[in-house]
């Protein structure tokens, strides 16, 4: 039986709920991230008509990338946060841990994944690599463009930014290179969101021109790229997916846990039940 695997960047989805929803609580415990996350999952599984959902959570606190490059993701947190921000982030963390360790497994979901030192996109990438060119379809749910490098005939990306499905064909037509070259482009142009500096004076647009062999050799940018091999090598280790030694999970096919889903929502004080 051919399956459609919905592989969710769960850390990303939790952060989106945290930024977009008002504060909610039940019996003194914060719940806005949990409810925003679960509502999105419910919408996604109905949209793609599949019960085979994989939740990928990251363990960035011990990321191997920080050991390779100390400034990796260094600007994502305020150096001296005020007490309100500290409390808000702690509430976010509590809800992420609650989803990963308690709510989702207890509801009956079998594929709830986290590996030491690995980010969500590492796990998503290793899953997509293991299932690429099989008869199953893989839909990566994320807003992280780094995962474009994983696109294949049966591996697609559903963007949380514009709610559109990105395919291998779309990528080739839009960028003029195969997905396998995307990590090189990111290594040359840098990744602002992850604080990975590229070749000085070279951005993504110029890096794409170089990758397509459209950048004249006489330009300063071309010469900078050629001279910046060490920067590119360092960055490849940071942006290439999957990174490190991410384990290949054994995914478990299963049906949507109707009863567990209802019980989970009731235990969280849901006034209106999301459909099971």
For each of these PLM feature ranges, what is it?
Residues 2-137, 147-165, 233-234, 240-256:
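Noncatalytic, basic helical substrate-engagement surface that gates or grips nucleic-acid strands
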Residues 121-130, 176-186:
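Short, motif-level signal for alpha-helix interfacial/capping segments enriched in acidic residues
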Residues 130, 153, 212-213, 267:
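Residues within well-ordered alpha-helical secondary structure of globular protein domains
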Residues 140:
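Conserved SAM-binding loop
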Residues 165-175:
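Short, charged, surface-exposed secondary-structure boundary motifs
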Residues 178-250, 270-274:
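Accessory alpha-helical DNA-binding modules that contact the DNA backbone or grooves
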Residues 261-276:
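Long, highly charged low-complexity segments enriched in Glu/Asp and Lys/Arg with interspersed Ser/Thr
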């Amino acid at each position: 039986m051919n399956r459609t695997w919905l592989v969710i960047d769960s850390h990303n989805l939790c952060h989106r709920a945290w930024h977009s929803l008002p504060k909610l609580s039940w019996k003194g415990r914060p719940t806005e991230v949990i409810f925003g996350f679960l509502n999105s999952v419910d919408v996604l599984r109905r949209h793609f008509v599949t019960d085979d959902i994989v939740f990928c959570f990251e363990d960035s606190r011990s990321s191997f990338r920080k050991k390779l490059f100390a400034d990796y993701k260094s600007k994502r947190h305020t150096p001296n946060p005020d007490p309100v921000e500290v409390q808000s982030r702690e509430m976010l963390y509590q809800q992420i841990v609650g989803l990963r360790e308690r709510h989702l497994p207890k509801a009956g979901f079998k594929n709830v994944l986290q590996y030491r030192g690995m980010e969500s996109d590492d796990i998503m990438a290793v899953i997509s690599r293991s299932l690429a060119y099989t008869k199953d379809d893989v839909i990566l749910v994320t807003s992280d463009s780094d995962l474009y490098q994983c696109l294949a005939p049966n591996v697609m990306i559903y963007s949380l930014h514009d709610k559109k499905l990105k395919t291998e064909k779309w990528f080739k037509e839009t960028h003029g290179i195969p997905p396998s070259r995307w990590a090189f482009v990111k290594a040359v142009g840098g990744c602002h969101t992850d604080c990975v500096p590229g070749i000085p004076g070279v951005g993504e647009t110029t890096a794409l021109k170089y990758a397509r062999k459209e950048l004249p050799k006489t330009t300063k940018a071309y010469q900078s790229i050629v001279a910046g091999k060490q920067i590119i090598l360092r960055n490849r280790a940071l942006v290439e997916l999957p990174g490190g030694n991410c384990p290949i999970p054994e995914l478990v096919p299963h049906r949507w846990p109707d009863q567990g889903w209802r019980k989970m929502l009731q235990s969280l004080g849901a006034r209106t039940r999301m459909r099971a």
